[in-house]
Every structure is written in C-alpha cells, then in structure tokens.
Amino acid sequence: MAIYHATMKSFSRANGDSSVAAAAYRAGFDLLDTSTGLGHNYSHRGGVDFHQMLAPKGAPSWCFDAQYFWNANEAAETRKNARVCREVEVSLPHQLDPHQRRVLALALGQLLVERFQVAVLVAVHTPSKLGDQRNHHVHLLMSARKVGPGGLGERACAEFDARQGGGTRALRQIRKDIATVINAHLKNAGNAARVDHRSLRAQAQEAAR
C-alpha cells in the first residue's frame, strides 16, 4: 500500500495571507506583491523539484505568468477578509520515479483545473534531507476565482463552503478522485502499490467484515 495524504486549506486576507507570498514560497519564486509593495524572494530555497502554472482552455496567456497572475488574483479580492486562494497538498508515491511523479502532479493539477475552472500552480517538493525520504509531495495552489477567456470571474469552489455537511462531502469526493488518479498512474508504471482515500478506521472496518 502506498502512502495517501491529501488535504485542503484556505488562505484568507483576514489572517494576513497573500496568494503572491504563497505562490513564491511553494515554487521558489521571487515575486513582488504589487498591492503591498512587499517582495517575497524564495528563489534560493531548496526542495522544489518542479513547478508549472495551469489554467482552463482558452484562458489568457497572462494566466501562465506567475508574477502577473497571482497579483491579478490578489487585486480581484477587495474585501479585508477575502479568501485569496486554496491549496490542495498531495503525497506523491515514492514508488514512482521523478519524471513519473511530475507527470502525476500535472495530472492532479489538471483535475482541479477542469473540475473547478480555476488556475493552479503545481509545485512538486522533494523530501527534506533530515525527513522521511518517501515524503515526495505536490502543492496545488488554486485561484480564488474561476478563470475564463476574459480572465478572473466569479468565485470558485463554493461547494467546499456548503453547510449541513456539503463541504465535507465535496472534500471527500475530491480526495476519492485524487486517489483514482494516483492509482491509475501507479498501474501505468507497472507498480502494484495502491492508495486508499478512506480513513484508517473505515479500511479496518472493511477488513474485519
């Protein structure tokens, strides 16, 4: 069984978060937040194996320019407590080689692009020297708004904020879909390992039947 880890978090201006800073840190960029004048230089940080911007078909070319896009993403949010982006972090199987992990990371990013019509920064990180050497993972930073031919539009991913359990169901579904993509890539690589998106408790209950 391969390691499965997939979590989602939100970034809010109310907490002092900036999507420009988040993008710079995750991809090892040197970005200037034009709304604050603050620079975020992580170009010398280690551990970033690969990065790429993804956007829906027909999106303007500037959506693939991290400096321009994430500043546009910030400018689109005017409220002091606005959510400026979301992130999905996913473990990448150590059973795959570096190229296979990059291809998988792009496939996961494309899943989010097509499902939610957002732009996504894909940033693959390698294990830290002193950490678990199986800890390959990808950060998938998602725009707060949908992206179309005209650029940034209406707010995206409202299903994750739904009440009465709707948000939990939406998160459970995307975790399941992520596991499906990972397992397809493991199978294509000729590896017998698989991931399971369910909790350890749910897996144990099924095994006990």
Regions found by a protein language model. Name each.
Residues M1-R209:
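N-terminal nicking endonuclease/strand-transfer module with a His-rich metal-binding environment
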